[in-house]
Every structure is written in C-alpha cells, then in structure tokens.
C-alpha cells in the first residue's frame, strides 16, 4: 500500500514527525539458513563478560560452568556480569521498605495460582524444544510427547491435570537412572509412481524406543534450543533467541507469575501493562518529577540503553532475589520457585542445525551438524567462524554448549524488571542522602531515568551514582547509546514523550492492509485496524478516510472483486458482472461480491454483513448466510474472533474483530506437501489433539467451563454433560422424544466401548 509521505506532513508539528524516521514500511528482514553462528556469538560473548569468574564442573553432566557472582568490581566502563549478592539483596530490602507488604502479598497471590494452574497452560506458546525428538515442535505436541514418555516411565502425578503435579514428575524424572523414549525416524525407498511411471522416493515414518541414561536426559532437560530472531527491523546483524523445553517452562511460568504480581504494584514498571494504560502510568512518574522540581531544581531525563542486558544478568542473582522475596513463605513454595533459576544456572544451549558446505566445482552440498563441531578439522572454515569454534570447544557436550551465566532472551522479563526497578527505587532522597534524587521507568531491558538536582554538577553526580549502582547488580548502562535531555522530551519502549506522549503512528503501519485470511475476516480486520488507530494513535479523520479508501482498493485488488460496473478485467469479472446485473438492490452486495463500499469513518464498528443486511435481495441473503451451502467448508464462528496483527515493535498482537459467519468465511486447506515428510506422524497427532479439544469445548461452552478435576476423564465428562443437556432440552420441549432416546443410546454405547477397551 503506497502512502504519499508529503501528505503526512501538511499540518504536523515537527516532534510528531519522528515516527516517519522509523524503518517500518516494507517487508522486514528475515534470516535464512542456520542460526549456529549467532548462537555461538551469544555463548562466547556471555562468557567474555563474565571471564573473571570462577570455573567449576557440573558433577552430573560434566559441563564446565563459569560463575561470575561476587566477582571483581569493574574498573572500567566495559560491560560485565559481576553482580554482588549483598547489593542485590539490599536493593530488594529497600524496595520492600518503600512498598510495605509487596512481596508478602505477591507470594500469597502466586501461591493461589500455583495451586490452581492446569498443565494445559503449557500448551500456550509457539515453538517449543521437544526433548524427545531433539527439535522444535508446537507447544501442545511437545507437552503431549513429554507426558507420554513420563507415563511410560512410571511417572503418573500429572494425570490429575495440575501443573504443579506435572512439575513433581519433572523433578522425579531427573533422579531416574534411565528414561525410555519414543523417537521418530524415517525410512526412504525408491518406488515407481503408477501415474507418471517415474521413480520417486517414498518416505515412511517409524517410531522406535530408545533408552537415555541419566546424564543424557539431564542434558536434554536443561537444553534451550536456539533459533534466529526473524523480522527484526533497524538492525544489520541478526541475533539468536532461545526456546526452552517442557521441563523448564512450568517452573519459569510460576516465577514470572510472582514477578508479574510484583510489577503490577510498582509504579516505575512498564510491564505487564501495555498501550494506553502504560502511557498513563509513565506520564504519572514524569508529572511527579516535574512538579517536584520547583523553580530551584533542574530536571533531566536519560533515554537509556543497556548493553547486552540478557548476557550480563545471572540466574544465580535471580535465585538470591527469589530467596529474599519468598522469605517466611512455606518451604514447598520456596522450592518450586527456586528451581527455575537453578535450572538456568545449569542450562545448555543447543547450537542449532550446524553449517552447510557446498563445493562449487563438484556441485556437492553437505551439512555439518552441530554435534560434529567439537571434532571436525577447522581448515574448512573461514577465519571468523574458526575463532568462534575454537572459543566454544571447551564448552561443547553432544552438540550443545554449556552456558551457565547469562539469561537467554525473553525468559525472565518480569523478574529482571523487578531488579531494574529496585535500583530506580534507590533514587529517593532518603536513600541518596544528598541534594540529587532520581526516579524512572523500567520495562525489561529498556529504561528512562529522570534525575533532579539543584545544579548541573548535581545532575552529573546523580547519573554517575546511578551508573555505578547498576554495575553492582550486573546492569550495564551504555554511555554511548544513552542520551540526556531536559525532562519533557524522551523515548521509552518506542513511546516518544514530548510534554505528553506523541503517537508513533509508523509503528502501526505494518498492520494496515489485507491480512490474507479470507474475504470475510480481512474486511473486518481492515476496518477494525483503522478504527483502533483513530482511538489510540491520533489517526485523524481525513487520514483515516484516506486509509479506508486505500484499504478498499487494496482489498479489491487482492480478491479481484472490483465493482460489478467497472471496466477492469480479472478472472472473476465475468461472474461478478453477471451477479451485478441480476441483483435488484446493488448496494446490498458485499464488496467481495463486486458491491459498492458503504464504509465511512462513522460506521467502522459495524460488520459489513450487518451494515448491508437491509439492502440485500432476499435470495442473496439466503445464499450468503446459509450454513447448508454445499460450496463452503464452514467454520463455526463465535461473535468475536481474534486476528494476529503485526505491529512494528514487539511480538504479534492479538486483536479482536467482529465475525459474522457467511459463505465468505472459508478456510484454506492445509498444504499437502507436509503429508510426505517426517512431520506427518506429528501432524496426525496434532490434529487428533485438536479434534479432541474442539469436541470437548463444544460440550462445555466457555461460560460454564470448569475443567473436570479428579478421576473423571474427558470422555466421561462429555458423556455426563451430554446426558444433562439432553434431559434439560427434552423437558423444555426443545428436542423430541426420539432424539432424546437416540442421545441416551449413543452415550451408553460410548460407555460400553470404554469398558471393553
């Protein structure tokens, strides 16, 4: 979608134009090939930042580990990970002193969550490292595989469906001398294709049992798989991100629940809120500093940037924080929460796919898997790769690298925010005991620092003190990348503040346009995005009207549904013209059927079908909203659907839009090519899982959805629910006697089959 940039500048104050300098139009860069190099960079850098720490060897896995905690105090400005335990604990104590009862209350809230969370919480989330197959899988499949393996190894606590019981199994699994797992393998054979008479390779999937000893199992359980982060704008170099396995995820979830609960109570925390709520929270802190800096005081703000936040954090520090936060709590609770940081202190980073070599002269390509990097002759690699491999070799075990210091990206966002806020908290006058004082905002690794003092020397002293205090807990403020301004102008988490937050509209640009789900959803999402931007992002009426016209144009080109009376020829125009001519009320045709656009900025909240319903010919209504229409594989749609929109910053957001089911709400069929690959068995498992969940949710509409607890299985729950519903429907006259009898018969048959099984 082309937007003429000059139109944007007609009446825009200069500071609002900041957003046009963002690299957010066009396609974002994606990574290709292997992430092995990026992962080695991360591992090597992390060790370099902590190089003066103490080396030890893990007695269970034999992995060499570097511990920088309480290491030497830094003498220069280089980033370092030498956090001092007593400093972290003191910062926690002061945080508690200024917020009485905060840790206590958060622990109570978390304890309640721990006792109620079901294990299916772990099915949320995208790709997950599946330790049974040693590669990434969708979260639900990885969880199912893990539970299946646990069950076949005699671990059954998780049958009750509580997450805490699954975690008990995880702990027990680590004590077992060996584990038996099922892995997939593929056989290839050449067969003649009946149709084309050519030879083709046919792949079949087998499952085989394999025994894993304690050491190998522990390595897998502690492994984080790595991938390259895609679609990152404004960077030349790609970087690696990690995805943990199922053993770690549950423990991390509880730690983050506790930290989230603390963050919600801290006014300086930019997490877990977002959007307008976050802006209001931030504006409060700024207002406080500006009103308190009376005429006698200066107030400056640093737009802060930290050097390699994750790689200088340390799981051992997080353990110290948790130990402090949960003091006086029951032993079991403290144990559950301390496991995540302990596992992270012993984590292993999987190096990914390895390297691809090709010989131009011989037209040969070969994959060097990560497992071989420990032993292969380095003469095949270029200079920089050779250096990386040499450096990482002492750390390698079975294609994974021991990575004790550092936290991989995105694992403990909430807890690290608590650490950051605890340093901001130390800026109160009662702690600094001088004329300067500070406050600020923290959101994961991003921060803004507001310093007040009677003169410039005081400001400088305040900044220096903040900088040095951060160093003591392993936070490295970058002097090169942070900049200071009079309070009133700064940037924080891509929000630009200039006497109030300026809408950074360019961030939303990627979400304008046609999503490509289907005609019905795309129309609805398109107008909802425009509506939301009018509400939240200062999208003015004239620009919104222009955006709407561009969207409709874009939509018509995408689905080739130009108006019935247009001159444009496409492969759909013949059908659409015919429909146009035989329709009495042409205004009633949907845009996707060649109708006119009736949207303007006043009615964006109404789904198109509803907007045009009164204008439609009766037979058109009948065809459009007919669930028995044989040409449509129909998808049942609740009144509200969720679309994934891509804002420019951060992860894809989920956005609600109104969904009215019509014959345009089709679902494209799955690409067949996956059916011939090694993923096929997994795909079938996944579909089975999906079908069961969908069926279950049909019986328990979300309003009355208490998951069955205790011994009853999903099937029993559904059968008993069906009987209750049928009786109510029969007694109220909604179903006939024969239908009631048939339902009862089916229920009995199902129970009979279960008994025979």
Curated annotation (Swiss-Prot):
> Which Enzyme Commission number(s) are on file for it?
2.7.7.48
What InterPro entries does UniProt report for this protein, alphabetically? Answer: RNA-dir_pol_NSvirus (IPR007099), RNA_pol_PB1_influenza (IPR001407)
Which intervals hold domain RdRp catalytic? 286-483
Q: Name one GO molecular function term.
A: nucleotide binding
Which stretches does the entry tag as region Promoter-binding site?
Answer: 249-256
- Which EC main class describes this enzyme? transferase
Describe the PTM: Phosphorylated by host PRKCA.
Q: GO terms for CC?
A: host cell cytoplasm; host cell nucleus
Keyword Transferase assigned to the entry: answer is yes
Primary location recorded for the protein, binned into one broad class: host cell
Q: Which residue stretches belong to region Disordered?
A: 50-82
Q: Where is it localised?
A: Host nucleus; Host cytoplasm
Composition bias (Polar residues) maps to: 55-64
Query: What does the UniProt function comment say about this protein?
Result: RNA-dependent RNA polymerase which is responsible for replication and transcription of virus RNA segments. The transcription of viral mRNAs occurs by a unique mechanism called cap-snatching. 5' methylated caps of cellular mRNAs are cleaved after 10-13 nucleotides by PA. In turn, these short capped RNAs are used as primers by PB1 for transcription of viral mRNAs. During virus replication, PB1 initiates RNA synthesis and copy vRNA into complementary RNA (cRNA) which in turn serves as a template for the production of more vRNAs.
**Subunit structure and binding partners:** Influenza RNA polymerase is composed of three subunits: PB1, PB2 and PA. Interacts (via N-terminus) with PA (via C-terminus). Interacts (via C-terminus) with PB2 (via N-terminus); this interaction is essential for transcription initiation.
Question: What name does UniProt use for this protein?
Answer: RNA-directed RNA polymerase catalytic subunit
Native organism = Influenza A virus (strain A/Hong Kong/1/1968 H3N2)
User: Gene behind this chain?
Assistant: PB1
